[in-house]
Amino acid sequence: MKNNVVGWFEIPVKKMERAISFYEKVFDLKLDRHKMGPLEMAWFPWLEDKSGSPGTLVYHPEYYEPSVDGVLIYLTAHSGDLSNELLKVEAVGGKILQPKTEISAEYGYMALILDSEGNRIALHSRQ
């Protein structure tokens, strides 16, 4: 297979400003915001020639609803140790659902959080 199966992911939000603030502060990054009529998106940084899939926060009053159920997205902790990102979650309106837990020596660690919009999101790191 030459390409990843996942084209991109969308994380539903109710309040774009609040969601952007949450993700920028937890992951120490800048989202790229776009508005197309009633559809609003804020894209995570990504490079086309690197591994992983691009993703965006998305708001549309008719088509998207944040949820703790359903698909689970794993976001890479760019600090290298998801403990660093977990330290910021509650301070910016999120909740830790499952603390840092070892998956295995080979695959590293994961944690589950509830973001500022009510979405269940997983974090992953090798350390």
Question: Which ranges hold each PLM region?
Answer:
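Short beta->alpha transition motifs characteristic of CBS
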Residues: 104-107, 123-127
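Vicinal oxygen chelate
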Residues: 15-16, 73-117
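N-terminal beta-strand motif that seeds the catalytic metal site of vicinal oxygen chelate
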Residues: 1-20, 70-73, 125-127
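Core segments of cupin and vicinal oxygen chelate
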Residues: 10-53
